[in-house]
Curated annotation (Swiss-Prot):
GO molecular function terms noted in the UniProt entry: metalloendopeptidase inhibitor activity
Species annotation: Mus musculus (Mouse)
Protein name: Bone marrow stromal antigen 2
Biological process (GO), any one: response to interferon-alpha
Known glycosylation sites: 70, 94, 97
InterPro entries: BST2
Membrane topology: Single-pass type II membrane protein; Lipid-anchor; GPI-anchor
Amino acid sequence: MAPSFYHYLPVPMDEMGGKQGWGSHRQWLGAAILVVLFGVTLVILTIYFAVTANSVACRDGLRAQAECRNTTHLLQRQLTRTQDSLLQAETQANSCNLTVVTLQESLEKKVSQALEQQARIKELENEVTKLNQELENLRIQKETSSTVQVNSGSSMVVSSLLVLKVSLFLLF
């Protein structure tokens, strides 16, 4: 036969019956009372929280929370629209700034061209004055000269040279 090894000593049957009787029922009774008390406590707490959750103050708080949430969403939408408008305004400002810079550069070019043209006009006016003076000098020489043919030939050459020179200056 196999060896019997038990962690406890064998107890006669008549002793086991006495322990399981009243002591065992007490433990079950204590456990049942604890379970009932726990259940009653849970029911009372549930009723208390249900009453508290349905109270006027709680409903007012929930209503205020919903209003705050709605106001927050409204403000967020307004902020988004404002930021979009600001971005558009900045884009337009940048475009306007580029246009202003381009127009300033164009104006500076036109001013420099106008100054160059004025300088060229002054130069040509001086040249015309000089040529008029030479023409006057040639007329005086003509009057003082004794021969009419020589004077008329030379004045014709000088006149044609002056016309050629003035036309060349005006072209360039």
